[in-house]
Amino acid sequence: GVEVNGLTLVGKADHQGTGIFVEHDNDRLHFFNIRMENMYQGIKLQGCDAITLARIDATDAVNGIEMNGGIQNMVTNSLFGSAQGGVAARISGESNLIFSHNKLTAEDDRCASFTGCSRVNISDNEFTGNKMTFFDISGQNNLISDNVFTVNRSDNQLNGKEADYGVIHVKGEYNHFTSNTIHADWSDGIENPVTVNAAEGENNRFASFTIENTNSNQVFYVSESPE
């Protein structure tokens, strides 16, 4: 394997370039203590296996981190941000990923999406943003535990979605949400916005939730399709 440690990566003016781009099965790469400045994409991983990212600062980026089709990767103790319509974390098709002890902040649009993932452990993270399109997850056998989700007031808080879309929007099977905390402060004029929407799938479990949802009488929504 290869270890990369202690770098500051600076993009061109007005957020251009990618800080770290790894593609294909580059086994056992380790990235530690790396800071991104003025980047369009902080980190992009395509089809990678057993990569470790720790103590990464990709807050000064349009898109913080993007991962696709990897196996047994780890992202921990890192900072990711987004701006200008980007996404702090866009994760798709990952399996056996550990995503823990990270802080993600989205200025607008989505904070994090985990699409088509399996056996992913998302634990002890802090997610902060200001839009309804906040946290999406689909797939199966994922664990989402001990996270703090905070949605602050903003203009255009629904971001093109209906009020029942849900801050946490879940599709899939056998996903387990436990011991999470959600703070949702809704802007005036939004009628009964939903905090958690179990939109599709079966055998998803929600336990030991703390939900602080101001200005809404509709907190947890289960559509007709889940079983």
Which stretches of residues belong to each language-model region?
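Extracellular parallel beta-helix/beta-solenoid repeat domains
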Residues: 1-227
